[in-house]
Amino acid sequence: MRINPTTSGSEVSAVEKKNLGRIVKIIGPVLDVAFPPGKMPNIYNALVVQGRDNEQTNVTCEVQQLLGNNRVRAVAMSDTDGLMRGMEVIDTGAPISVPVGGSTLGRIFNVLGQPVDNLGPVDTNTTSPIHRSAPAFIQLDTKLSIFETGIKVVDLLAPYRRGGKIGLFGGAGVGKTVLIMELINNIAKAHGGVSVFGGVGERTREGNDLYLEMKESGVINEENIPESKVALVYGQMNEPPGARMRVGLTALTMAEYFRDVNEQDVLLFIDNIFRFVQAGSEVSALLGRMPSAVGYQPTLSTEMGSLQERITSTKEGSITSIQAVYVPADDLTDPAPATTFAHLDATTVLSRGLAAKGIYPAVDPLDSTSTMLQPRIVGEEHYETAQRVKQTLQRYKELQDIIAILGLDELSEEDRLTVARARKIERFLSQPFFVAEVFTGSPGKYVGLAETIRGFQSILSGELDGLPEQAFYLVGNIDEATAKAMNLKNLEMESDLKK
């Protein structure tokens, strides 16, 4: 008898306890377990190790291989310290199942769906198995539509696809976390959606910092936890490879419930998708598989595909995924990032140079790309404006060496005009964020796509050539820039009168 897959893997019925196995071999996080003839568990079933004298060890494993001779090989989801040969193992009869639904918002979970934030148990009876098929082709929503973020540089130059996958590239300290939090905030306000954050194999300190910053910025509501906009799932660097390999699926399962049952638009963050591949490589070696190129697992593209194909738009709702991508040794041909790129619809590249200039979000307008930036999808007006913005910025980039050596005065009249407009565009691509209000003191701005296009058209047409470039820095729409220019002019006049 098998228990219902929507029952938590750790809750084992009395009947199920009869299907007991025993540990016969332990190699690090990998266990070999012998079961009675005819009682073999299925692949991906969760096994729970029983301690001596019925003490609970809280070690859950996942069946990966059926070895023959009534033995299975399983990978542990937590440390195997203290386990011994001969210990009893219970087959739960179902894959690892995790809590889903509104009660997960504002909480932090581990790979098994257990809360780790000391706020008590999760108030839900609804759970879902982490292993599921991707939606059938007939369920998919094939409409190509833009997912408006309210962030000017993203919406204009590298728009996100609803139900698409976006790669987020950036080093330390260039604003990845703030950009992630702003996206979480904006999807909640503009789309009535929720977010799920999957911390896969990254630093525990960063996970803690993110949680505290989310509380500070109101993304997680401390006074009323269910009013929060995000659920967090962590499987950090110190966890065994089994946990790091499966934590992405746990986060995705929670996101799928919001999409399929609540019919919401969901934002799924995975930080970092490379660590998912890395954990799979460790597990593969422990299971005795022959490695392929650069030591990666032979099943690399299958594992990546099984995760990525579940991230999609259906007729009920959408999951739009933003995945931080670490590129080992900056080698884009490495099998891990190369396999990831095959699934991405857009790339958002954060630039240290722009961050150093104080332009936030520090999204590089020339390096960031999107498959959605085509006239038949975004329309001629949007496409033309984006191309002209890129051409202006590219020309400015080409002229920077000449400016550095000879100065602005040596440029032609046309080039000087291009530089002036490019500098205004560069500053207008910055914008104040809601989640950064506590640091900047400036109220956050959500800028609609139509307003964004209108603003950049005004700069490119030369209408605003007379305004100072600082008027375009950290404003929302173009009307705010003209108002700021008037304020600057008035302040200048006042200071002149005082003199």
Curated annotation (Swiss-Prot):
Keywords: ATP synthesis, ATP-binding, CF(1), Chloroplast, Hydrogen ion transport, Ion transport, Membrane, Nucleotide-binding, Plastid, Thylakoid, Translocase, Transport
The keyword RNA-binding belongs to this UniProt entry's keyword annotation: no
CDD domains: ATP-synt_F1_beta_C, ATP-synt_F1_beta_N, F1-ATPase_beta_CD
PROSITE patterns per record: ATPASE_ALPHA_BETA
GO molecular function, one term: proton-transporting ATP synthase activity, rotational mechanism
Membrane-protein topology: Peripheral membrane protein
Xref: Pfam families: ATP-synt_ab, ATP-synt_ab_N, ATP-synt_VA_C
Catalyzed reaction equations: ATP + H2O + 4 H(+)(in) = ADP + phosphate + 5 H(+)(out)
Top class in the EC scheme: translocase
Annotated localization: Plastid, Chloroplast thylakoid membrane
Keyword Lipoprotein found: no
Biological process according to GO: proton motive force-driven mitochondrial ATP synthesis
Homology family: Belongs to the ATPase alpha/beta chains family.
Function field: Produces ATP from ADP in the presence of a proton gradient across the membrane. The catalytic sites are hosted primarily by the beta subunits.
Protein name: ATP synthase subunit beta, chloroplastic
Lineage: Eukaryota, Viridiplantae, Streptophyta, Embryophyta, Tracheophyta
